[in-house]
Amino acid sequence: MKNAVGRDIPEENLRVTGKDVFRGSHAMDGKEYRRDGARVKPVINSEGSKLLPSIKDALLKCEIKDGMTLSFHHHFREGDKVLNMVMEEVHKLGIKNITICASSMGSQNNPIVYMIDDGTITNIQSSGVRGEIGKAISEGRLQGLAIMRSHGGRVRAIESGETHIDIAFIGAPTADEYGNLNANGGKANCGVLSYSAPDALYADKVVAITDCLVPYPNWPHQISQIYVDYVVVVDEIGDPSKIATGAAKPTSDQRKLLMASYCTEVVKRTPYFKDGFSYQTGVGGASIASTISLADVMRERNIHMSFGVGGITKPMCQLLEEGLARTLVDTQDFDEYAIQSAATNPNHHYITAGEYADPFNKGAYVNKLDFVILAALEVDVHFNCNVVVGSNGVVSGAQGGHPDTAAGAKCTIVITPILQGRIPSVCTDVTTVTTPGEDVDVVITDYGIAINPKRQDLMDALKDSGLPLKSIEELRDIAYAMTGEPERVQFGDRVVGIIEARNGSIMDVVREIKPFQFAD
């Protein structure tokens, strides 16, 4: 069955999942539903401590069994140690058929890939997956399905009851013996615990894992004791030095700096760039560089940002410190500078993942965005974006807040080089659609800028800018002239993953890859 972005979704997947095809970003606006609830065992009179000696003890107390759903956050990014630690204990107990519901997974989780092969892990729900686990999914080694959701879509799935968490594990930089948790004040700080908030609220059991036990009460807390069942102290929950890895680094690449300068020129010419504008940037090098160059224009024009939101980086914190931004509302910190800012700056505020991007609450922060600056692996001539599946067909990225912010912002700008290596980034059709073209307004490459034709207002604002404006088809043709039109990735018939739209409908499917075969 064809959906609103032209992807054919197999009827079998619609039947098995009970989902509808994607019918547009705002198709479910105003739809009423009833939130799910956790199973709660009241603690009316206790001994005053929830401490347990080990993760194994916590698993046994939570009555771990085959077929359960376990959840984790990824605030430590590639420095996370909690997910692997817990799953090793699950494996030792001989538990099978586990669904992992993680806010994201990466190469730090490579050591548990064997648990996919032996049936310990049979389903994965995540923003995305990188590394060996992504490869295992694409090769069809996961017995069940991998469901990739945006950050907002994950909250929606949990609170609607579509995903019910049996046990949530929250790696907490500090905790007291009664379960008040904070992301700061310990030896492995991560700034915020935003992705754990829905898990704490809706999971049947919640286990805090910390390497820094502090006196009661741990105040201020980001996760309250009223949601936590048990606390376990371990040697090490994460390595903060590995938070700023991969995408989350500034750049000195001249091509990326050129695209950042184009981005600044676009932003400053739109009607939204005025005192009190709101802004989010991604963590790609060009996106971070665009924040730095935009600050010069803000100083020149005496324009101040009302709030910056989302994943926070050092340049955003520096805008706050300088007074160019009034407030930061934070769901994830991408470097140690941002972590320190979250702990010390009174105008740097923690918000939950639901407050940030949940499409099924009564209004998330993304709805109030003027600008969002994003990256993409691929953009097609329909302005659809792919941020999850690589050009080789392997799951190697994450939706993150990409679809959420694109849907909410008044001006969504996607920055991507015309080529990624020798692979065109602008193409006729993306390998997999993760963000629909209806939500993308401007595409910036190192060879020119394309404006979505439906945004005549932006075309008018930029027509005399002197910028290298081109149609999206022209950008594709430039890319193809350099490399030739690439061969399409060859997939098998089996669907191994689902790309969910943020509202829970099916945007696209991911099929099992098969060895490349040359045409006769």
Enumerate the predicted regions with their spans.
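Conserved alpha/beta enzyme-core scaffold
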Residues: 1-520
